[in-house]
Design a protein with these regions (language model features):
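Amphipathic alpha-helical interaction segments
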Residues: 1-88
Length: 88
């Protein structure tokens, strides 16, 4: 699945929600749409599990990196949320 396919799939999910989320830029909103725990603790744990090497302080850098990684993992798994993202 291409990144464009993933974006189209997520947009379709977002369009069906009453709450308007900024999933294109916000890892918290993206995780909410995917029904993943978007808490700070969960994001820190997921960043560690995915190999983030920077500070785990919830910085914009960490969140941007994590957003990119989640989108990549979705593309690699054919648009299905992989188990590795669910348990964080």
């Amino acid at each position: 699945m291409t990144p464009a396919d993933v974006e189209a799939m997520i947009k379709k999910i977002a369009d069906g929600q009453s709450e308007k989320l900024n999933w294109q830029q916000s890892i918290v909103d993206l995780m909410k749409l995917l029904k993943l725990d978007s808490s700070f603790t969960a994001r820190k744990q997921l960043a560690q599990e995915l190999g983030y090497k920077g500070s785990l302080d919830g910085s914009a850098e960490m969140n941007i990196w994590l957003h990119k990684e989640v989108m990549t993992k979705l593309a690699e798994s054919g648009g299905v949320v992989p188990e590795s993202l669910k348990h964080a």
